[in-house]
């Protein structure tokens, strides 16, 4: 028996959403010598949170079809655990902690995305 679903049914990502997700993850994880503006951090955090909430149920669906205990299953369930932890956390007090939270959401989205088929768009393989 696979892990219990903790989220609503998946909202499948479109090709445009996948492209935007890739750009958002890149922005969140781009190295910078200075902290970004608070407004930019907030906007990107909201976007990444939304994507993580879409990705979690998709990965949960995939995990349900995996062999329990296999390497892929362990990596996917670890990514799900990290995503749930990040989604349950807040940005904290101050810009530095908000940037850290945004970056964590970027890493979470990247890890979750790695557990989906590359061509998956709206629930079908392309």
Residue map of PLM features:
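Hydrophobic alpha-helical packing segments in soluble, helical-rich domains
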Residues: 40-60
């Amino acid at each position: 028996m696979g892990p219990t679903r903790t989220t609503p049914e998946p909202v499948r990502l479109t090709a445009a959403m996948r492209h935007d997700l890739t750009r958002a993850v890149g922005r969140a994880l781009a190295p910078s010598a200075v902290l970004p503006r608070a407004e930019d951090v907030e906007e990107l955090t909201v976007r990444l949170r939304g994507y993580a909430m879409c990705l979690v149920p998709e990965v949960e669906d995939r995990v349900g079809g995996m062999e329990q205990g296999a390497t892929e299953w362990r990596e996917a369930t670890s990514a799900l655990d990290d995503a749930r932890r990040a989604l349950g956390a807040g940005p904290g007090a101050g810009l530095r902690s908000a940037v850290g939270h945004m970056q964590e959401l970027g890493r979470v989205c990247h890890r979750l995305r790695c557990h989906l088929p590359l061509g998956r768009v709206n629930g079908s393989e392309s």
